[in-house]
A protein has these predicted regions:
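General marker for long, soluble alpha-helical cores
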Residues: 1-105
């Protein structure tokens, strides 16, 4: 595994998320990228720890609110393909997710 601490390209908050992932024994290379904000890294790390398919949202085009909505949908085994689109606002994503939870397609 790469030594992300020595690359000195991350903020202290980003480095903390990388360190937390290493402690969680997950593949931090998925999110240890300078283009992700620390809070985005956090959402990806949570997904990795929970063993959900983070490839749906491990993309810097999503803000962390959008990532959270996609992650919550994945946790509930919802069809997130209906709203996993960086062009859809997080509040619209939430509406779609809540509809899917309620059985509304």
């Amino acid at each position: 595994m790469a030594d992300f601490a020595k690359e000195n390209q991350f903020t202290p908050d980003q480095q903390a998320e990388i360190d937390a992932g290493i402690k969680n024994n997950i593949d931090v290379s998925i999110y240890a990228k300078p283009e992700f904000l620390a809070i985005q890294m956090h959402e990806i790390r949570i997904g990795l720890v929970e063993q959900i398919p983070v490839f749906y949202y491990a993309d810097s085009r999503y803000d962390w609110f959008q990532m959270e909505e996609i992650r919550k949908g994945l946790e509930m085994s919802l069809d997130v393909s209906k709203y996993a689109d960086p062009e859809i606002s997080f509040d619209r994503m939430r509406q779609i997710r809540k509809g899917l939870e309620a059985g509304i397609d």
